[in-house]
Amino acid sequence: MVGSSQLEEVRPGERKALIFRIINQQQNRMRREGYIIEEIIEYSNMSEAFDAVLRGTDRKRSTQGRYLLAHREQVIVKLTEAIASGSFQLGGYHEREIEEYGKKRTLQILSMYDRIAVYSVMNVVDRHLQKRYIRTTGASIKRRGTHDLMNCIRTNLQKDPEGTLYAYKFDIRRFYDNVRQDFVMWCFRRIFKDERLLVLLERFVTMLPEGISFGLRSSQGAGNLLLSVFLDHYLKDKYGVRYYYRYCDDGLVLGKTKAELWKIRDVIHGQMEKIDLEIKPNERVFPVEEGIDFLGYVIRPDYVRLRKRIKQKFARKMHEVKSRKRRRELIASFYGMTKHADCNKLFKKLTGKEMRSFKDLNVAYKPEDGKKRFPGVVVSIRELVNLPIVVKDFETGIKTEQGEDRCIVAIEVNGEAKKFFTNSEEMKNILAQVKEMPDGFPFETTIKTETFGKGRTKYVFT
């Protein structure tokens, strides 16, 4: 039996052949997931991807955005067919240099059309991957993030002060640039068996000659999966490392002694060497009481402060920016960081304002058009036929690509908020009548289809 631990013993020219031998062995004894493409091409998922990519006024007003909005349904149908057949191909990209946390990065930017396709695929793929991740990894994972991971660290420091006296902090050198594409595909093949999906994923992964794209939506999931397989589960399952946290390519381990952490450090180096990655030399083992500089904060057992660089950057921008609107945006962003730390005095010093909870402000969004906004994804009424739903509210006079006076209906399906558009005068009339009743909303119903006229179909509440 050939295992992943043998990869480092093989010459580079033979490694790929060995990887595929491992893949075949794993496929024979692991239960992999299939029928993922069918989930991807559901209208609700494709529609969600379209809306997510075209979120924001600037994107909607761009040349690409205006075209896509004018041809929304045709675009969704075309992409659905291409993904379903496995024939979708990325249409190229342009690059832009950005600076992030003092690092210069090259960002690959796809067309909005391609981004809709990538988002639709990864929206489903990430959902299947998330259940395989350890609890204490947080980058690009829904309902997790820097604040969630920081709270995990704070909780563990407070619950087990004796077992978390020291910290080992590390960072992977040029992670996205140095990721081996064949190792990423090895990981994907351990989980998915749908060949159409694997073909699409391979096209995303191999978009660049080497490494994975920093700007591609799929790269976040690919990087997380690679480190989940070769590092996270290895430390947790084989070595029983209790206090281990990872945010993308940054890692942290807490332990009782320095000796214990140095041993774990050697294990981490060994695992990274297997997949041709390298830990930066600025790694260190140190007492927790010095403060753990991680996730944009300096974390100590009894309090948390903002990282010095973030404070300085905010103060500099506040000094440079004169626009009131821009200053309000900066303060709102800074508040989002400081509210998760012990920084009330700092916030007042730099902004001149008292830190208050949003709930204390007692304000709510008031749209200029006076129309209600409902939560949930937009679904086609066709998807709701014969399903029990709860109708919660509605709004008329909505302008869409299909017409001026459409009605949007807020519903709940299996506890999940959704909404659909209709131009049915019958439905509008019924909803208006229900609105006049003292306790009309919410109400339960099932949407059915009825044939009328010359083979025409209408949707009705029953």
Regions found by a protein language model. Give the residues of each.
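Short, conserved non-catalytic motifs in the polymerase core
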Residues: 58-65, 91-118, 132-144, 204-225
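Conserved polymerase palm-domain catalytic core
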Residues: 75-78, 82-83, 92, 101, ...
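OB/S1-fold single-stranded nucleic-acid-binding modules
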Residues: 355-396
